[in-house]
Amino acid sequence: TNSHFMNAHGLQDENHYTTPYDMYLIFNEAIKYSTFTDAINQQSYTVTYTAGDGEQYERTWFATNYYFTGEATPPDNVTVFGGKTGTTDEAGACLSLLTKDPYGNSYFSIIMKADTKDDLYSDMNDLLSIINKKQL
């Protein structure tokens, strides 16, 4: 691989780096777990957990994926199954996305280092539009 992670949260570290292919490998492995696929396929995801002090807590995460918040629409004949977003000043706006075509074929798409979130989703839609060209 061509990745080196210094932390689990993904925030900037000068020795923290990855590639689109390595993100694909990680994402491809993660979708084998129903907890992950459930979480990436919803507008919000709530968990209850027991902390080290024995207390139970509930936490809800809300989607930042524009396809789930309604701020972006994928091309025709492309269904967004779910994805993982990430944005830092150094990395830019990033998105790993799992989509499907009308025939049930799955596609992984990854955009990294977009200048803005609007650019990220414009670039992603350009990439996803290739799915329709493949079907011609």
Which functions belong to the PLM regions below?
Residues 1-136:
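Penicillin-recognizing serine hydrolase domain
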